[in-house]
Amino acid sequence: MYFKTQKLKNTIILLIGFLAITIATFGQDFTVRGFVYDASTGEGIPFAKVVIQPESSTDADNQIGATTDIEGFFSFPSVKKGSYQITVRNFEYEEVVQNITVGQKEILTLRFELEKKEDVKEIEGVNVFADDRSKRTKVEMSVNKLDKKGLERLPSFGAENDIVSAFAVTPGVVTTGDQGGQIYVRGGTPIQNLITLDGMTIYNPFHSIGFFSVFETELIKSAEIYTGGFSSEYGGRIASVMDITYRDGNMKEFGGKASISPFMGKLVLEGPLFIPKDEDSGNGGSFIFSSKHSLLDYSARTIYPYANDGEGMPFNFTDIYGKATVKSSEGSRVSAFGFYNSDRVNYPNIAELNWESYGGGMNFTLVPTSSKVLIKGHVNASRYETMFVEEIGMAPRISGINGFDLGFDFNYFLKKDSEISYGVNIGGFNTDFRTFNEVNRLIQRQDYNTEVSGYLNYRVNLGRWVVNPGFRISAYPNIPALILEPRLGAKYNVTEDFRLKFAGGKYSQNFTAAASDRDVVTLFYGFLSAPSDVQENFTKPNGEVIQPEHGLQLAWHGITGFEYDFTRHLSLNVEFYYKYFPQLSNINLNKLYDDVFQFNEIDDVFKKDFIIETGYAYGTDVLLKYTKNRLFLWGVYSFGMTERWDGFDWYPPIFDRRHNVNLVANYLFGEKKDLELSIRWNFGSGLPFTPTAGFYQGESFSGGVTTDYTTTNPSEISTLLGSFNSARMPTYHRLDITAKKRWELKNKNQMEAIVGITNVYDRDNIFYVNRVTSEKIYQLPILPSIGFSYRF
């Protein structure tokens, strides 16, 4: 333990020394930086093109370009003294040109407000320049980025747009159906996905119906989905990252949106908190509020009488979110927010689930007037609890987690689109979990944990090369363990249109699922810390016996691939990945004995609550994307293979889908592009399951060893299972269609009608089979829907 502590101290000292030298070096240049805002709302504009050039020069070689980040921030870190012209462009806004003088201050901070164009000739969902520039100057391995416009061009479920649509069509992502609402990314489980909202971890982002998340699409500013090889700024999970950012409320005027459909009713309100005396100063504040509640309890029996044998659709959920933001003229901002989410699903005589989550926090961006660093931070706390009863008479599974998080991130912007960032994060959580395994043995745990992590990330452009090394230190004092996580990304621009790329690294996490990865139905979604009571010995596939040092989950990622732009509008992305999981933890379904003194001679794998596993995943993801004016096409093919080793045998987990296809098409009709049609077709090869080999009468031996089993009449029927996950379910496929019509009204008000059909050809996709009664429950049937929204 002393060695690990000393090692951490030495690493931190070296890191601080390196940063001190770096800061001193960069502090000698003039810096021009600033923010670009929407003049009508005060919201930062991401992906705007900012160009600076000497005032007397028109030579393109003297131009320096930058792209604004998600908050509208840009920076030119090394500018010589003199007079310059700055041009700001975005395809939806009027161009702005301003002359400036550099040299009077070491740091010059600017502010631009752009007016929206009245008639945008070519809206493509993304800024083409910004997209092309980031392709050449950033590694961007295994990431898909979408804004609100991009999300709205995907087919909606139940006449409501939701980010679930984006997750479902992301390369490398597997969903096990319409119900359950969880996703599996390149061999990882739901517990191994880090999902954040403005820096706050969201423990369960999906509702049980599977069509809807806890996120409000109207509030989403950006969504970044990393399916592997993510850089050192992200940690705490070993499979994927889904980083979601909400916009602020309108700082200039009050407004909102109300919508209704058979699935839910929704309301969004926003406006200024106060009006500053000088409205052009850049100071101000805003609020935004959203609420949605499911209406299926009232609508399903009438509109969908054929669903669930006339019993309606047993889903009920509520989501509430509110945020207040204050901004300064220099670009600094602080936000405070709170949320509440709940979910309930009830299949009579089969299963019942309840969960709720609530919390709040604040985040800030600080732009120091005398420093070139951009500082961001967050602090938050939340509670998540869930209860699941699988069958009548069975004891419920109960899980709860309380968590807090405090983090700071620092960014330096260098020449040629290079950047250094570093940060520190402190988090803590306590978990409470109770369940029974298949032989009715109690599994119960309550833990308290603290995590401390720090990272350093460096991105540099060297000619045709983009190199992105990084390093993360994750300390788990309660275990105790110190994990060093190197990361590396690289890209080589062979030509303007063809790029090779690579990313890889080590990842760790302290969380373990409070449900087995072998469960066929995964409605239950609970959390545990890394188990401390795993078996003393673990047998690897090659027969080697090792002693696990801890119960953390670990992974190594290795990904390579290429990007090719056939034209400005048609692009191909191909990636080959391999993930090695040297250590995973899982609930021990083989537990037969309590872990007490009298069973000391029994092997650990038959009495411990959790077991250690290992495994791997590999595959190929292909994405073909076409975006031009009215037409948007998105085609994805994924091949994947996942295997786990539990110390005895190799087995495929329940999410091991070999082939997955997603085809999406969207077209805007009409002179005003006010009529929209979206289509999505999904195909998935069969998922593995454990077949039933037969049934037998079990004897409870209620009289102990003296029970005369020859004269008793066993009352219990037990199931004899076949080889684990040795069979495959039928293939899954589904077609969804959505049509939208928009009407522009007076005073910038707007009305929209959405008509959708989910599962157009009414495919019977199996969801669950009761082993005893053989009763089949199917995924959702054909579901036509119509919804209306009014924006004011």
Predicted regions and their residues:
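Transmembrane beta-barrel wall of Gram-negative outer-membrane proteins
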Residues: 31, 263-295, 306-344, 352-376, ...
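Short, acidic, small-residue-rich periplasmic hinge/interaction motif at the N-terminus
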Residues: 37, 49-55, 89-93, 103, ...
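Short acidic/polar hinge/loop motifs at secondary-structure boundaries
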Residues: 77, 153-155, 200-227, 312-314
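Extracytoplasmic beta-strand/coil segments of soluble accessory domains associated
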Residues: 155-201, 221
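A beta-strand signature from Gram-negative outer-membrane beta-barrel systems
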Residues: 169-170, 214-255, 266-268, 277
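Gram-negative outer-membrane beta-barrel transporters
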Residues: 577-580, 599-688
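C-terminal beta-signal and adjacent terminal beta-strands/loops
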Residues: 682-715, 728-736, 740-792
